Structures are given as structure tokens and as C-alpha cells.
Regions:
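Short, charge-rich binding segments
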Residues: 67-68, 90, 102-109
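Hot-dog-fold acyl-thioester-processing enzymes
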Residues: 2-96, 159-305, 369
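A short glycine-rich, hydrophobically flanked beta-strand micro-motif that places a catalytic Asp/Glu
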Residues: 308-313
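HotDog/MaoC-like acyl-thioester-processing domains
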Residues: 1-20, 96, 103-202, 206-207, ...
Length: 370
């Protein structure tokens, strides 16, 4: 693929973005505006989550929720367009998110979202020198105007040319495996524990205890495609006329490929040559995808009656196609807050190189033994 010059971060564009800070607008055209059983199931299958609470409607109807209920990470599929992104042509590396969940995300709920640009922080990074950490804040409400959740997400905006020239990840190589190594990894999937209908009581939780790990990988482009099926078109994956119309409005969101066709910058997740143009050795996962994996550690552990009130995660390193991940957690604290019984949990994920690529934490409300 021919190397080209990409746009640069300018003072004028930063000043323009500063003027947009705090302006709250409608989150337009989300992939999911309604929480339905099918939408929940598609999202869960997109991360390989077989929890029956998300995929078996009859089972979900028998739980305390009296129907399917979505995990917090489902809200990634409810994000929409509208908030100022700015910095046209400057690559966006998704770096993390935080959730505050106020009400269960039950099937049958219609969601209304608003979004605002709430942060623009200059950073000096090893990856691409001057970068800009952007924060967007989403507020999701139901038909009664009750707040369901507040979600913040962060992007590191980096100049593609600088990132490629600095070549921070030149020693990072896509993984390969022998048949016996694949067999060993696949056997670990059988050890996954879904608590399900067996309640996890607050009384029984021990500070320091570890949560059963969740394994993902070795990552394939197929897994990224499955994620997109559940997550949706956002941010730039539009077909034919929709794609052409989006390109006409936002030409800098597309980069011409070797065939002379404008194509989405999102193809870093399935086109290894294009990924190399932005300074990464090969295609890699989506940040929200890995955060959803980490959230699965919680939902597997807490059982059907648990409720995640807070959850945050930061992506620290790339997860290349071919990498395998072990997502884990540990109980840090137990406490009573008014009539709620809460557990604070530390979360992390490591790849086959034993490098920690994602960190996070959560507060989970658990039932008390009667």
C-alpha cells in the first residue's frame, strides 16, 4: 500500500473544538434505539457470550428481571452521531469508557441518548508525539425521562504519519500457534463458569477472592466481524448509497485504498496493510469489544441477581489479530451503603505475552441472604 501524507493537528482546529465543549446534543441514528431480546442476543453472541440471561428468552423470563436484561456494555450499541469529533483526518484510538448504571437495561425499553464533548486534553505520547485525549459523555433516558445510565468514552487522537514514523510497536509481531497450542487454548474455554441462577450472595464474598477468568481468542478477523454484527454500523461502516452519502459529507473519514476507492478508516480492524499505515503492525480488535469482554467477567461471576452499578475500563495496548486474552478480576472491598450491599472489584486482561493490555474496575450490588 502506497504511503501518503495525512492531516496534522492544528492550533486553529483545537480552538474550534474548545468552543464546542459542553454542548449537549441528541445522539442521532444509534444502531439500537430499543432494547429487545434479539438485540441483546446479537450483542452477546458478538462477543461469544453464551449466558442464557441474554440468549434464552424463556430462561430470562424466569429470573428476578422477568425478562431479558442487557449488560452495561450493550450501551455501546446505543451510541449515536451528533457530538463534535473534529480533528478531521486525525486518527482516533479508542482508549476506554466508564459506566454509571441507574436502572436495569430491560427488554422493551426505548432509549433516548444525548451526547456532549466534555474533554480535550493535550498529551505527549511515545506513539505519536502530540496527541489529544477526547472525552464524550452520553446520557441515556427512557420514555419516562428517567436516566438509565451515564457513559463516558475516551479517544486518543493521533497523527497517522507521526505514529508510523515513530514505529513504537516495531517489535510487536502477530502470534502464530501449533495445533497442540490451539487445542490447549480451546480446552480452557470449557473452564468458563457462568453463575446464572445460583445467586452470588454478598455474605459469601471474600475480599481477595478471584473471579473466574474469561478467555478470548486467538483473535480472528471473523471475531471482529461478529462484534460488528452485534455492535452495529458505528462509527463509519456504511454500505453503498449510505456509504457514498456519508463520504460526501465527511470525506476526511475515508482514506482511498490501492484500487482508488475511498474506504473507511475503520478498516484498521480487518486490513493489516492499512493498520501499518497508522503505526500498528497488523489489524487489531475494537476497544469497546475488549471492554465488553471484561464486563463479561463480572456478569459471569455475579449471577442473575447481581447488578453492576459502576464499571470502567482503559485499553492500554493493542490486541492484534492472533492474540489470545485472559480476562480476570479480584474482589477488593465489601461495604454496605444504605440498603445496598456492594462489592468493589479490580479487573484486568493479559495476552499470551503476559502483557496487561486492559485494566478496569467495577462496583456490583449483590443480594443478601434472607
Amino acid at each position: 500500500m502506497t504511503k501518503k501524507q495525512f492531516p496534522k493537528i492544528t492550533k486553529q482546529e483545537l480552538e474550534r473544538m474548545d468552543r464546542a465543549l459542553g454542548l449537549e446534543v441528541e445522539a442521532r441514528d444509534p444502531f439500537n434505539r430499543y432494547i429487545t431480546f434479539d438485540n441483546i442476543r446479537h450483542f452477546a453472541y458478538g462477543i461469544g457470550d453464551i449466558n442464557p440471561l441474554y440468549s434464552d428468552e424463556e430462561y430470562a423470563n424466569s429470573t428476578i428481571w422477568a425478562g431479558p436484561v442487557a449488560p452495561p456494555s450493550f450501551l455501546f450499541s446505543c451510541f449515536g452521531r451528533g457530538a463534535p469529533q473534529g480533528l478531521k483526518g486525525i486518527h482516533a484510538m479508542w482508549t476506554g469508557a466508564s459506566f454509571e448504571i441507574h436502572r436495569p437495561l430491560t427488554a422493551g425499553t426505548k432509549i433516548f441518548g444525548t451526547v456532549a464533548l466534555t474533554g480535550m486534553e493535550p498529551k505527549n505520547t511515545k506513539f505519536a508525539a502530540l496527541s489529544i485525549l477526547q472525552e464524550h459523555t452520553y446520557t441515556f433516558r427512557n420514555l419516562s425521562n428517567n436516566v438509565l445510565a451515564n457513559v463516558k468514552e475516551w479517544h486518543m487522537r493521533t497523527e497517522r504519519d507521526k505514529a508510523r514514523k515513530r514505529n513504537k510497536y516495531e517489535n510487536l509481531r502477530p502470534a502464530t500457534y501449533t495445533p497442540s497450542e490451539i487445542e490447549k487454548i480451546y480446552s480452557e474455554y470449557d473452564k468458563e463458569i457462568i453463575r446464572g441462577s445460583n445467586p452470588r450472595y454478598w455474605d459469601d464474598v471474600i475480599v481477595g477472592e478471584k473471579l473466574a477468568p474469561v478467555i478470548k481468542g486467538p483473535l480472528r478477523v471473523t471475531d471482529n466481524v461478529a462484534w460488528k454484527i452485534g455492535w452495529g454500523f458505528r462509527p463509519f461502516t456504511y454500505a453503498h448509497k449510505l456509504g457514498v452519502e456519508y463520504y460526501k459529507k465527511h470525506p476526511m473519514a475515508y482514506i482511498t485504498n490501492d484500487s482508488g476507492i475511498p474506504d473507511t478508516s475503520e478498516r484498521v480492524h480487518w486490513d493489516p496493510q492499512f493498520a501499518q499505515l497508522v503505526g500498528v503492525p497488523s489489524s487489531y480488535d475494537f476497544g469497546p469489544q475488549r471492554v465488553a469482554w471484561l464486563c463479561q467477567v463480572l456478569t459471569n461471576w455475579m449471577g442473575d441477581e447481581g447488578f453492576i452499578t459502576k464499571f470502567w475500563s482503559e485499553v492500554r495496548r493493542f490486541n492484534l489479530v492472533g492474540d489470545t486474552h485472559w480476562l480476570e478480576g479480584k474482589v477488593l472491598k465489601k461495604e454496605k451503603h444504605h440498603d445496598k450491599h456492594l462489592v468493589t472489584i479490580e479487573l484486568w486482561g493479559k495476552d499470551q505475552r503476559e502483557e496487561q493490555t486492559i485494566t478496569g474496575g467495577a462496583t456490583v450490588e449483590l443480594p443478601l441472604r434472607k
